[in-house]
Amino acid sequence: MADPIRTEPIGDVEDASALEPFQLGFMCGIEVHQQLATGKLHSRQPGVLYDVTIDTVPEQWNRYQRRLRAARGEGGAIDIAARFESRRNRSFVYVQSPNSGLIELDEQPPLPLDKQAVSIALTVSALLEAKPVSLLQTMRKTVVDGSNTSGFQRTSLVSTDGVLQTETGPVGVDVLCLEEDSARKLDTISTGNGEQVIYNLDRLGLPLIEIATAPGCPDSRTCKRNFDGTRKMLASNPSSS
């Protein structure tokens, strides 16, 4: 089958809403994150979120100040985002909520994956007819905005090559991952030593299921339909919060 002939975009190229996506060769997938109602992913702390703001944080909650410094990775190079962040001269204050301990403070090695979170991820994989990997291995993604005390987000690939059944037909699912959520930002203030960002550690480490679909959406309407299908599928799992 011959490739379709693409014409030049019709309309004002300075106004994105005036252009038809198919004329631009637009095609995308979606990435959906779903928080799980379990304990934290790499510590045995409870998955609790506290209803506090920067003005209502209890005085007895400890605070720790840190600075993240860029370091060379295994390949010998410094990540470009980490290099940029180190030049911003920012410091970070972490408020230790009752459900955060040494692991959340990056003072203790992480524990194995929460078994209930893994079970839910495998259940969702089965709903998507995805193929589980033979071995769960935890990877580290560089996080340089201070929302993770370790400077990394821990992510595990659970399954691949799935399919989401929607009202308009099947949608390919490239990967399903299990990863930890970030800390919640409470405030950003300016000091004589640079910008200071304050985070609450209650959310840090909560399990997230990440679902990434294949790039099969030619327009925003299809994206919304695929998202709605993913949302309904996740809503059928009672352990998704």
Please provide the spans of the model-predicted regions.
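Basic, nucleic-acid-interacting segments
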Residues: A2-S241
